[in-house]
């Protein structure tokens, strides 16, 4: 698998992301139990046709995803781990993995998708609500249009939904996935 490996950190150093998240969690007395959600993982995936038709590269996808992460995860420690440039099973779909600490490090301006009191405050735990996800999807779609990239309607329901477990059992593991799984064990 070919990948554009360049780790970027938001509100953290990418090389010490795990330790910095632990310090933030301890500071706000959060994520003390093993079963607490310590991180959230998001994937921004691009149309394979954008490579040949619109000149999308791993570097450009990484830059777009970094801007989206800054916009959608303000105040959180976030790590853009890797942009895969040949997709899973050589499908050609470039995609970027974003991991955020579940605890907001710094206070931010209130965002339209925030519906709980004090959700913008430092120490607040991220909630992947329908309102947030719809805002995130809409933002991704708008950004892809601005960049002249293909974009499906992410707000339309999928014809067939499968669970993450079903998805993972349908395809063989590769070295990147093994690395990524080991990486996540640091946070959970």
Segments predicted by a language model, with ranges:
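N-terminal nicking endonuclease/strand-transfer module with a His-rich metal-binding environment
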Residues: 1-188
